[in-house]
Amino acid sequence: MASVTFRDGFLCVSALITFVFVFVTGADFVRFVSFRAINHNLSGAAPLCRDSVPWSVALRDGVVQKAVAVDVLLLVVFSLQHSLLAWTPVKRVCQSVFGVLSRSVYCFTTAAALQILMHYWRPVTSAPCLWSVSSAPWEIWFPLICFIVHFLCWAIICSILLIFDYPELLGIKQVYYECLGLGDPLLLKSERAQRLYSHLRHPVCVELLTVLWLLPSFPLDRLLLAVFLTVYLILAHSLDKQDCAYLRHQLRNKLQLFSTPLEGSEQTNDNNKLE
């Protein structure tokens, strides 16, 4: 049995802390971007906006301007962290400094930047909403529809993360392979898979965009969040024909894999009948 060194223990604890922190941050983000806004409509709390105030007056309000400035600054900080650490020269420096923990460091700092964004986010309540569903019976039904759609989108996002090897995305697999002396797990994948992973940084674009834009009430701060993240996701999308062909090939293989046991069991039953 291989002995566990202090270094191995440190790597495992660091990766585990990162996993827990990212998981908690993900749950907080779901509540921040989705269910808190929908629950606000269902609970009948104070309105998110002041529709009686004209836009010309609201945009000159110092409180609105300060809140918008803070929110834009938070979004810029998050995007800089998320993009700068994914830049190839910076990735090489992180790899040389942190080694096998470089992916965990990236995920940890991303979660930290997201926590800062959510904690210091300033709702803009002194400006009108872009839209607000407040007429009966849609004031009840539309938030429920949004809740169901959001729930389905988050379920799809979780399933996609499972398909895309989430232990590797969070840096856990790298540490596990390092402790066993197996090397980098990404190098064990095919070149086409490595190419896809390098291009598909955000495999949940459609679902996340649906969550960002589908709400019963759409205040100004939500517009900032939705527009900024939409532009960021579009700019980060770099799939080409080869990647799409590889995805179609993998989907075809998965469908064949699921159909093979069924066909095999049917053939076995037929053979048993013949015997």
From Swiss-Prot:
It is found in: Nucleus inner membrane. Keywords: Membrane, Nucleus, Transmembrane, Transmembrane helix. The chain crosses the membrane at residues 5-32, 64-85, 103-119, 139-169, 197-215, 222-239. One of its GO terms (cellular component) is nuclear envelope. Residues 1-4, 86-102, 170-196, 240-275 are nuclear. Residues 33-63, 120-138, 216-221 are perinuclear space. It is a multi-pass membrane protein. PANTHER family: NURIM (PTHR31040:SF1). Belongs to the nurim family. This is Nurim.
